Amino acid sequence: MSRVAKAPVVIPAGVEVKLNGQVISIKGKNGELTRTVHSAVEVKQEENTLTFAPREGAVDGWAQAGTTRALLNAMVIGVTEGFTKKLQLVGVGYRAAVKGNVVNLALGFSHPVDHELPAGITAECPTQTEIVLKGADKQVIGQVAADLRAYRRPEPYKGKGVRYADEVVRTKEAKKK
């Protein structure tokens, strides 16, 4: 049995939750997020909480209920507070700039790299070597950050590349003669 699924999700004031069969819509000050719940999970709304339980006869019911609870809790946090992800560019000549919904990266290639941001995600560059992504959907922010990092992953000898702000890059020792 999932311990995560047993804890209810508290709905704060100013957040509106709509249950429509297996589709849940959560609306707050940062926008609206919608998710389809797995068929093995039953979601009930009681006043200002959401509770989760497996449907009768579902083999993976508790596992899916725990996953659903974690995803919906992230949605509630996203529409109230939002999520941020910070990236750093390490390397000589590595720069980032934001123009509208496009992040422009200079990463040592012969051409600049332009990455278009999906709807609901904003980016800003406090310095030329930092990118801050903000948005309500935790999953989309993580995917955009991973896409930006994939253009030039940190290499293990000098540590140059795009890295998460809290990432520790283990460097290798150079070959000895």
From Swiss-Prot:
One cellular component term from this protein's GO annotations in UniProt: cytosolic large ribosomal subunit
Record keywords: Ribonucleoprotein, Ribosomal protein, RNA-binding, rRNA-binding
Domain of life: Bacteria
InterPro entries, alphabetized: Ribosomal_uL6-like, Ribosomal_uL6-like_a/b-dom_sf, Ribosomal_uL6_a/b-dom, Ribosomal_uL6_bac-type, Ribosomal_uL6_CS
Segments crossing the lipid bilayer: none
UniProt-recorded Gene Ontology molecular function terms: rRNA binding; structural constituent of ribosome
The keyword Ribosomal protein appears for this protein: yes
Glycoprotein keyword on record: no
SUPFAM superfamilies registered for this protein in UniProt: Ribosomal protein L6
GO annotation (BP), single: cytoplasmic translation
Family matches, as Pfam families: Ribosomal_L6
Similarity comment: Belongs to the universal ribosomal protein uL6 family.
Function (record text): This protein binds to the 23S rRNA, and is important in its secondary structure. It is located near the subunit interface in the base of the L7/L12 stalk, and near the tRNA binding site of the peptidyltransferase center.
Assembly behavior: Part of the 50S ribosomal subunit.
PANTHER family registered for this protein in UniProt: 60S/50S RIBOSOMAL PROTEIN L6/L9 (PTHR11655), LARGE RIBOSOMAL SUBUNIT PROTEIN UL6M (PTHR11655:SF14)
Listed name of the protein: Large ribosomal subunit protein uL6
Species annotation: Yersinia enterocolitica serotype O:8 / biotype 1B (strain NCTC 13174 / 8081)
Phylogenetic classification of the source organism: Bacteria, Pseudomonadati, Pseudomonadota, Gammaproteobacteria, Enterobacterales
Gene behind the chain: rplF
